[in-house]
């Protein structure tokens, strides 16, 4: 039986209807089978850069940037023997013959997608088991294939896993996972938020709405892990995922289309009109000046509408500039204008606006330590919004026309090449809707 009465229509990234009258809970991370697959595969999937390993060994470039160890060069035809190596990796990683282990060659064997069996994830305390097991299997497969002796085995290890375990992360490694090691988490339950925005953008091949969707799915699923989306707050997060992340009722698409030649301000005007029309808000009182103060008929739904408007405003503004740097100020001043225009709270009840203040400073103000693409929901600057700010950053980086020093191509090439091979990572809107269709009559 459904807990919530809300029904939504789901549209794709091109504004095409996918399914209608879908119960809100059908897109819940706890019930939707596609989101379940995404979360499971995020934890069990590892990208292995065989071309990188081969090049690293050939030059003895080991352990990270500017590190060379003359005399430790190994000239091994790793890519040429990718199929043999992949078979050996699968045999070592696999637990049972018919389990869900998957080892797939990409780009003619230059990269591998290694998905460890789910049983390894279930029987481990944390998700780093996938990187460690895939890395160990890759090391052994290379040693066995080329009969590497005991004196050069450590060189192979360093080419694969980098400086680990001297470092807490995998500095200089040629294996990569979406999820960073748990020791880097800012707080409990932040694992799914600890994914670079650029990783998400590269995985969705810079499709704006799909990038925002994947970001929203990961962010909002994390809210269920941290305890934020429990009880009285569950519906707030489900509606946020639906309207901002999954383009429910085609709201984001409609707002962008209506304001294709507009500004952040015109998006806000369109949003307020739509919210009144859909009976989400109403006029509370009118001042002598004619200024109208609004109140929500449905607080959680208003937040979802405001979040959808925030994404639309980001797309309109950054899309006009084709430069992602303005995303922080867009998130900030969209909320500022919205609050002044309506008398209502901004997205995430002020947390998105507050996040944007720090985000502006640390992404391009006096400090300017890094572009928007290297931020994530676990970052000390952008962690404060409960899942509503980062989807806008993903959209902005998808629209960027190469202005960023930290571009998806530079920071996330391997992750993008490998993870984009998984259909429901590349096109989450479509596949989450399909998952919802499978279960909607059971709710």
Curated annotation (Swiss-Prot):
GO annotation, biological process: methanogenesis
Alphabetical UniProt keywords: Methanogenesis, Transferase
Domain of life of the organism encoding this protein: Archaea
Note describing how the cofactor binds: Binds 2 coenzyme F430 non-covalently per MCR complex. Coenzyme F430 is a yellow nickel porphinoid. Methyl-coenzyme-M reductase is activated when the enzyme-bound coenzyme F430 is reduced to the Ni(I) oxidation state.
Pathway entry: One-carbon metabolism; methyl-coenzyme M reduction; methane from methyl-coenzyme M: step 1/1
Catalytic reaction list: coenzyme B + methyl-coenzyme M = methane + coenzyme M-coenzyme B heterodisulfide
InterPro entries per UniProt: Me_CoM_Rdtase_asu/bsu_C, Me_CoM_Rdtase_asu_N_sub2, Me_CoM_Rdtase_bsu, Me_CoM_Rdtase_bsu_C, Me_CoM_Rdtase_bsu_N, Me_CoM_Rdtase_Fd-like_fold
Residues that bind coenzyme M: 367
Enzyme class, UniProt record, top EC level: transferase
Paired cysteines (S-S): none
Pfam families: MCR_beta, MCR_beta_N
Positions that bind coenzyme B: 369
Biological role: Component of the methyl-coenzyme M reductase (MCR) I that catalyzes the reductive cleavage of methyl-coenzyme M (CoM-S-CH3 or 2-(methylthio)ethanesulfonate) using coenzyme B (CoB or 7-mercaptoheptanoylthreonine phosphate) as reductant which results in the production of methane and the mixed heterodisulfide of CoB and CoM (CoM-S-S-CoB). This is the final step in methanogenesis.
Self-association state and partner proteins as the record states: MCR is a hexamer of two alpha, two beta, and two gamma chains, forming a dimer of heterotrimers.
Record's protein name: Methyl-coenzyme M reductase II subunit beta
Gene giving rise to this polypeptide: mrtB
